[in-house]
């Protein structure tokens, strides 16, 4: 293999842990791991380590959990490790300019889109939401901007009509490590070819919110069906019935025009719950009332038929 690099890894969720795992199998020397501080989780609000911390401790790696990398003493933690490169994957902290310049080869980031499309916090979800035909991962050289650095390597994958953010996340968690290992080899060999991002092609992947995930029946059925897949597994598309939130796990588009007002229930039977939208009909197939498990439309109709009387409107 190429020269073994001294690497600092910075990441937090499972997506990042899969990249750390690949690094540890690659023959490079991971000299330190930075991850977010333990956070309260679950009903008991017990402090829980990140997936990256769990893996790093299993492998006996030094772990650092600063709240910020702005203080001088925390930047010194990075400097003391004398790394060739810092690999950043869904870390969640901003790296100041001083930190970006510490490693000999700088800092590189694995981003879950084909940059410059979908810079920002929710690239996987936004690619689905927008109806993109493909997405992928970009390995880039980090600079002080938000996902603005030169691109070093890209891998793409198609987005299917069945993909959710959950399935795309898994696909990119397979692609990312492949791209990362290839990029590190090129950096070690001096064969990397940085490519400047075309600013005319930039789009921004804004954070998702629970309020955005509320179903807006004035949108087209096609857009709503994409939203349902984009917001799965979080924050989950939802509607409100009798003051209760009901999550929607799966729906299909019926490409038939209707004069009914958006939100009007047209049919409710074993084929699904058919609702008029701003364009076409959305057929709700799998739903989850508050406090219950997800169930088919037919099962929900068996217990709550009064919720879905044809002619009534969902708000």
Curated annotation (Swiss-Prot):
Q: Could you tell me which InterPro entries the record lists for this protein?
A: Fmt, Formyl_trans_C, Formyl_trans_C_sf, Formyl_transf_N, Formyl_transf_N_sf, Formyl_transferase-like_C_sf, GART_AS, Met-tRNA-FMT_C
- Stretches assigned to coiled coil: none
Query: What Gene Ontology cellular-component terms does the record carry?
Result: cytosol
Q: Quote the catalytic activity from the record.
A: L-methionyl-tRNA(fMet) + (6R)-10-formyltetrahydrofolate = N-formyl-L-methionyl-tRNA(fMet) + (6S)-5,6,7,8-tetrahydrofolate + H(+)
Name the enzyme group at the top EC level.
transferase
Q: Per its UniProt record, what NCBIfam families does this chain match? A: fmt
* Function noted in UniProt: Attaches a formyl group to the free amino group of methionyl-tRNA(fMet). The formyl group appears to play a dual role in the initiator identity of N-formylmethionyl-tRNA by promoting its recognition by IF2 and preventing the misappropriation of this tRNA by the elongation apparatus.
Instruction: List the HAMAP family.
Output: Formyl_trans
Q: Under what name is this protein listed?
A: Methionyl-tRNA formyltransferase
Q: Which gene encodes it?
A: fmt
